[in-house]
Amino acid sequence: MTLLLLRHATAGHRRPGVGEAEDRLRPLDGRGRRQASALPELYADFGVTRLLTSPYFRCRESVEPLARALALPVEERSELAEGVGEAEIWALVAEFDRATAVFCTHGDVLGLLLGEEPEKGSTWVVEPGGDRRLVRGAYLPPPA
């Protein structure tokens, strides 16, 4: 099994004073839309069979071009939303023993898995190693 851990494409910055409910609807900016459009080509050789995303609009928007290109449904999962607990995200990872899946999520969630928050639009290609471990295979910088 391979996981492609995608931090959503660029979506500008959270505006001061904006609550979580409104921030969930923040769309990608122009650069983010270009990054999302490049994912089908970037991921072409991985054989992706599942697309999972945070329910936040910027995450869903990041994977929509890939979903269209691969004719795959996008599965919204609360375990990929901002503020998720470590136990929840590792339980989701444990569900994937045979799929090649994209998890589109946020910096804080990726920080729980990777120990760092990668750049927006970037991808870590990893293999779960059991016992809450990931074997890092490759880092893919954000598409230009």
Segments from the language model and where they lie:
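Active-site-proximal alpha-helix that buttresses catalytic centers in soluble enzyme cores
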Residues: 1-79, 83-88, 116-124, 144
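Short, solvent-exposed aromatic-acidic interface loops
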Residues: 135-144
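Active-site-adjacent alpha-helix immediately C-terminal to a catalytic or transition-state-stabilizing loop
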Residues: 87-136
